[in-house]
Amino acid sequence: MTELPERSAATTGGAKTARDVSSLIAELGLTAEDSIEPTALVPPERLREVALALRDRGFMLMDTVGVDYGAFPERIPARFCVLHNVYHIKDRCRLFLRVWLEEGQALDSLYPVWRAANYLEREVYDLFGIEFVGHPDLRKILTPDDLEGHPLRKDFPLGESPTLFREGRFIDPPAFRAGLSGQNAGLTGWRGEFRRGERGDRVPPVLPEGGPQ
């Protein structure tokens, strides 16, 4: 059997790579966040500059996500953050860039740096309402054009749609929630305090007055 040569730590994501990433964060003049994955805190005004430096070192943009920390119990710098996931294929090295944003604050688009930012930033805009300055076509990508608001914001109202199942069962959201709390049969037809593994009396779901709407 032919033995494969051992890969160096720099190409296997080992300790050397971790030290290299820490050194890179410091070299860029950024602060490292205390987290499981290497994460750098990037001031909004420096994002494109940092992205260009990383691209020139061989990093590519893998993903961009938004987070709404509204009602988060711990103290945080701002309500929103945009997290860019960049990766160096040759070194198998990953780095996250976290940018904190206040309500209504826009962020420079990374489309001029990585074309992959096109759809990624459109998704963040659609779901959180965060605008990206310099994006060539910033518009919705997932939700209908006539939907008002941004669904992944914490202040977005939760919608409810009655559901008619193929076998004729009908359930509406209030009944579903009541079933989960044991107040009535709910979605599954089980009633009472028997939802933790104990069998109770099986009760057929009750259709609303007038039948399915």
Swiss-Prot record:
Its EC number is 7.1.1.-. It is found in: Cell membrane. It comes from the Bacteria. GO terms for cellular component: plasma membrane. SUPFAM superfamilies: Nqo5-like. The keyword Isomerase does not apply. Its main location: membrane. It is a peripheral membrane protein. It catalyses: a quinone + NADH + 5 H(+)(in) = a quinol + NAD(+) + 4 H(+)(out). It holds the Pfam family Complex1_30kDa. Gene3D superfamilies: NADH:ubiquinone oxidoreductase, 30kDa subunit (3.30.460.80). PROSITE patterns: COMPLEX1_30K. Keywords: Cell membrane, Membrane, NAD, Quinone, Translocase, Transport. One of its GO terms (molecular function) is NADH:ubiquinone reductase (non-electrogenic) activity. InterPro entries: NADH_DH_suC (IPR010218), NADH_quin_OxRdtase_su_C/D-like (IPR037232), NADH_UbQ_OxRdtase_30kDa_su (IPR001268), NADH_UbQ_OxRdtase_CS (IPR020396). NDH-1 shuttles electrons from NADH, via FMN and iron-sulfur (Fe-S) centers, to quinones in the respiratory chain. The immediate electron acceptor for the enzyme in this species is believed to be a menaquinone. Couples the redox reaction to proton translocation (for every two electrons transferred, four hydrogen ions are translocated across the cytoplasmic membrane), and thus conserves the redox energy in a proton gradient. NDH-1 is composed of 15 different subunits. Subunits NuoB, C, D, E, F, and G constitute the peripheral sector of the complex. Belongs to the complex I 30 kDa subunit family. This is NADH-quinone oxidoreductase subunit C. It comes from Deinococcus geothermalis (strain DSM 11300 / CIP 105573 / AG-3a). The lineage of its organism: Bacteria, Thermotogati, Deinococcota, Deinococci, Deinococcales. The gene is nuoC.
